[in-house]
Amino acid sequence: MLQIKGFRAALLGIFLLSLLGVQLNAKAEKQTVYVIPVEKNVEQGLASFLSRSLQDAKDAHADHIILDINTPGGLVKSAIDMADLITESEIPVTAYVNKRALSAGAYIALQADHIYMAPGGKMGAAAIVDGQGNAADQKAQSLWLAEMEDAAVKNNRDPKYALAMADPDIDAKEVGAPKGDLLTLNADKAIEVGYSEGTADNLSTLVKKLGFEKAQISYAKESFAEKTARWLTNPVIVPILLTIAFLGLTVELFSPGVGLPGTAGLIALLLFFYGHLAAGLAGYETVLLFIAGVILILLEIFLPGGIIGLLGLGAIIASLFLAAGSFTVMAVSLLIASAVSITAFILLTRVLGKRMKFFKKLILNDSTNTESGYVSNQTRTDLMGKVGITFTPLRPSGTVIIDDERLDVVSEGSFTEKDKKVKVIKVEGSRIVVREI
């Protein structure tokens, strides 16, 4: 009997252990790899997308994150924001250089715990430039070189090659970048210098190399709002939007009613602020500052003095810069928009002889003259030619009595004593001119 009970207990133990093994195996099969595309230009819209995607990966309890990188670079501020997000990630991150990680893209790739490259992939050419494509000032370059060096050091990579990507004065001739050239690593050279851990033909191959053969692969996708925000905050689109806005509102000043130019200008402004709000660049306080600026400029029309108008203009410009992802991009955009608007204004006023009709809606332009049929209610034309007696001396103004009515008058120019006869010779509104007779 005891043997039977022991046998049953053994069977039960084996059964429980097999169940536990199934559960452990199921847990292993539930591993998740989260793939986040880092494509096109690096700008604040992409930074916002990365922030949301990293949070989604965390919420999904992902075991690993792969950044699928193919970018020519972009804005330094956005790249630094993205670097901070990657560094703060509690989930291991692998950068997959799927074709190109250039300029700011190379900096982003260096933030990852691991780097793999596709055959033919390239990483580097990370010199910092200004809005016109020229070399940035020394202060900006120094900061950028420090960022590139830190990105390499914190992940145990030789900082020399990161610096050579951003500074042509660094000699890296052993990998094809002598002094005077910026370093761009291909897949083989990246492995040679320890920047890449290997090549992978595609994401599936990479996932296997990372040891997640049975993992579930989830792909982050941009929402419609994120795609729109990225497009509207693109450094090429921003000056176009502001030019349409400024030009449309300028032409509207010469149009009766609310026409197509004004509508187009307002829509362009709305799109500008919507894109920057959705990308996380601007807050509602920025929009309120812009609206306050517009109100102040309208007040300047009714209460001219200059100060209110200048405050309004300052508020509008400040709101645009606060919403901008890059000071340089916004400065260039405003210069372009202002130049086009001023040119249009000169063309309309000097060449075409147009007059601004907008202010006619706000200001009364009717003239009150006798030719237009207006007559003052104080005009005393009925007194013309009448005779009266001076009640006071006229020096040359004084008082006379005409038909028992006391009137304020002025003499023709000479002094006239009291109790003298005078005759009305001219009436101009409320002004009555008399002459002694």
Curated annotation (Swiss-Prot):
Superkingdom, taxonomy of origin: Bacteria
Disruption phenotype: No change in localization of FloA or FloT.
Disulphide connectivity of cysteines: none
Membrane disposition: Multi-pass membrane protein
Transmembrane segments: 2-22, 231-251, 253-273, 288-308, 316-336
Pfam families assigned: NfeD (PF01957), NfeD1b_N (PF25145), NfeD_membrane (PF24961)
Subcellular location: Cell membrane
Major localization class: membrane
Keyword Membrane: yes
Cellular component aspect of the GO annotation: plasma membrane
Keywords noted in UniProt: Cell membrane, Membrane, Transmembrane, Transmembrane helix
PANTHER family: INNER MEMBRANE PROTEIN YBBJ
Family affiliation: Belongs to the NfeD family.
Name by which UniProt lists this protein: Membrane protein NfeD1b
Organism of this sequence: Bacillus subtilis (strain 168)
Gene: nfeD1
